[in-house]
Curated annotation (Swiss-Prot):
The lineage of its organism: Eukaryota, Viridiplantae, Streptophyta, Embryophyta, Tracheophyta. This is Probable caffeine synthase MTL3. May be involved in the biosynthesis of caffeine. Keywords: Magnesium, Metal-binding, Methyltransferase, Transferase. It is an enzyme of class 2 (transferase). GO terms for molecular function: metal ion binding; methyltransferase activity. Pathway: Alkaloid biosynthesis. S-adenosyl-L-homocysteine binds at Y18, C62, N67, D101, L102, S140, F141, C157. Caffeine binds at Y158, H161, W162, T238, Y369. One of its GO terms (biological process) is methylation. Belongs to the methyltransferase superfamily. Type-7 methyltransferase family.
Length: 385
């Protein structure tokens, strides 16, 4: 099965769907929003062609469910807020938003929400229906999506850490896994494996920057958020917890060792330095903002979080209940690719073990997702300076 066919979130509205298990991502969007507003402010002040009439925006790797439209809402609100603050003709330009993800993404779950979303925009923002136009643009964001110099603003949250393919060179000349017992580029991976993943990310991210710089107008903006490398003190990340669960199944004879050794996630968590270096070497963009932040696995659930997102369960919960929350979110993201390799039948047992590992991490006070935000401006052509 082709990677693009399984690299998507759980669709629909079941208990394990992304639509029902994405409050963590809502929290991340809350963290990103101040940077988004500043990015929009700089964009509108740049006075790009046709921006007074229609601002063209794309969300790359939009996923599905309510979070997709939360991103759209934040972008629209930022544009309207800045327009009001600037007191100029940009107060209510038409906004054309393209939602991009791979072909297997559940776009229908988003489209079903549009009528109520448009009504809410009209009620809360004073935007008449028709002043915000939302459509889908399916396809890989590692390829061309839009005409040259046609877009004002590109946004992507929690997508660019996904690679276009599993790196080559993960099998030795003897046909043995070079990353035996490990499912991604971790601290325990041999140096050649770490280099293979870094090389693939460098190739993919360079392609991403080059292609989308061609689609952006001169001085257009791009805002990216992705998972990044953490600190030694953070403990195991969720991929490590998954890896332990799979290894336990192998040890107990419930899963063939070959299945584990032949599985490598097409995912890479870069460091801030790596991202900065790639952007500078590719050369199309100026870095306006670059920072990292960390959030606990169970953020978005606990009533102790210092964020706007709050749990539906306003009671004290132990680590097992919180671990179940973490597991549902993780399963919504990773189940399609895991089930395609290991089989549907073993998924309940696998995620049960994952939940136990997550509970241990939370009990020890460990368990963080590390994220990176980078705001970019396309460098003007010499003739535009």
């Amino acid at each position: 099965m082709e990677l693009q066919e399984v690299l998507h979130m759980n669709g629909g509205e079941s208990d394990t769907s992304y639509a029902k298990n994405s409050s963590y991502n809502q929290l991340v969007l809350t963290k990103v929003k101040p940077v988004l507003e500043q990015c929009i402010r700089e964009l509108l002040r740049a006075n790009l062609p046709n921006i007074n009439k229609c601002i063209k925006v794309a969300d790359l790797g939009c996923a599905s469910g309510p979070n997709t439209l939360l991103t759209v809402r934040d972008i629209v609100q930022s544009i309207d807020k800045v327009g009001q603050e600037e007191k100029n003709e940009l107060e209510h330009p038409t906004i054309q938003i393209f939602l991009n993800d791979l072909f297997q993404n559940d776009f229908n779950s988003v489209f079903k929400l549009l009528p109520s979303f448009y009504r809410k925009l009209e009620k809360e923002n004073g935007r008449k229906i028709g002043s915000c136009l939302i459509s889908a643009m399916p396809g890989s964001f590692y390829g061309r999506l839009f005409p040259e110099e046609s877009m004002h603003f590109l946004h992507s949250c929690y997508s660019v850490h996904w690679l276009s393919q599993v790196p080559s060179g993960l099998v030795t000349e003897l046909g043995i896994s070079a990353n035996k017992g490990i499912i991604y580029s971790s601290k325990a991976s041999p140096p050649p494996v770490q280099k293979a993943y870094l090389d693939q990310f460098t190739k993919d991210f360079t392609t991403f920057l080059r292609i989308h710089s061609e689609e952006l107008l001169s001085r257009g903006r791009m805002l990216l958020t992705c998972i990044c490398k953490g600190d030694e003190s953070d403990g195991l990340n969720t991929i490590d917890l998954l890896e332990r669960a799979i290894n336990d199944l192998v040890v107990e004879g419930l899963l063939e060792e070959e299945k584990l050794d032949s599985f490598n996630l097409p995912l890479y968590t870069p460091s801030l330095e790596v991202v900065k270096c790639i952007v500078e070497e590719e050369g199309s963009f100026e870095i306006l903002y670059l920072e990292t932040f960390k959030v606990r696995y169970d953020a978005g659930f606990s009533i102790d979080d210092d964020y706007q997102v709050r749990s539906l369960f306003q009671v004290y919960c132990d680590e097992h209940v919180k671990a179940a929350y973490v597991t549902f979110f993780f399963r919504a993201v990773f189940e399609p690719i895991l089930a395609s390799h290991f089989g549907e039948a073993i998924m309940p047992d696998l995620f049960h073990r994952f939940a136990k590992n997550a509970a241990k991490a939370l009990r020890l006070g460990n368990g963080f997702y590390n994220s990176l935000i980078i705001s970019l401006a396309k460098k003007p052509e010499k003739s535009d300076v």
